[in-house]
Every structure is written in C-alpha cells, then in structure tokens.
Amino acid sequence: MLLVTPVRGEITVVIADDDPRVGSALAGLLGQEPDFRVVAEATTGDDAVAAAREHRAALVLTDVRMPGGGPELVRRLVGLPHRPVVAGLSAQADPATWTRVLAAGGSAHLLEGTLAGDLPVLLRRCVQGHLVVGVPGAADLVRRLLSP
C-alpha cells in the first residue's frame, strides 16, 4: 500500500530549517539532481506552510525540531489541499520523535549527518509513495511493535 499518490516528473521542494546554513546545504545538494527543484526555503513552520501552499510543492523537507516544527507542522502540511509529501529531518534518532512525525502523516524521518548522497534516493522513495525511516534501530522497533 502506498502512502501518497506518487509524484511524476519534476519534484518541487520546500526546505524548512531554522538554520539557514543547513537549508542552503540541502538546497545545494538537491539542486544537483535533475528531477528536484527547490522552490523555497523557510526558517519557521508558518513560512514552510505558506511556501508549500504558494508553490504547491510536491515535497517538504523539514527539520522537526525547529520552532513551529514537529508533528503539528506535519499535520498542517499534509492538511493542505494539494497534500505534499513531508519528510522530517532531525539530528537525533529519538524514537518518540520519529514515530510522532510518521503518525502525523509524514512519509519519512531521516537522520541528519548520515545521509550525504543517499538523501535524493530516499526522498525519491517518499514521493513514490513509500514510507522511509532512516534512523538506526527503526526496523527493530517496528518489528517489536508488530509482533504478536
């Protein structure tokens, strides 16, 4: 079962991070990929929602610990009429955080610093409708939750 309707063609992206250096680095990385187009960078949750709405972004990559971020921001974004795919990004692998992000409607939770060249591949999986959890120990936790 796919979580979202897969995106076809160009993937428009809003990057939301309260550290502009991180946002710029992510934009630079995705800008090297022919199928990604960063349409906006935001530093607050409100700005991320406004940018996603204005540009009808297919994907929002957001720091889940920035002011106005987290599960509430994910709910606001997936509640937009065009329902963008939301990928959460965090410097910490805290299971409580990533499970709340996914429960709020996020399609991914990715760990900063472990992505490098994998980020475009993982984000493509998200926009194809797959759930992506790039956090150490996530598979074991999910197995425990699903076991009888």
Predicted features along the sequence, with ranges:
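Conserved acidic segment of CheY-like receiver
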Residues: 9-22, 26-30, 60
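Acidic, metal-coordinating helix/loop segments flanking the phosphotransfer/catalytic sites
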Residues: 41-59
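Short, flexible helix-to-coil linker/hinge segments that flank and couple to helix-turn-helix
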Residues: 98-103, 113-148
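Active-site residues of response regulator receiver
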Residues: 58, 62-64, 90
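A short, hydrophobic beta-strand element within the central beta-sheet of small alpha/beta folds
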Residues: 83-93
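Short amphipathic alpha-helix used as the core "switch/output" element in two-component signaling
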Residues: 71-83
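Non-catalytic signal-transmission and effector/linker regions of two-component phosphorelay proteins
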Residues: 1-12, 146
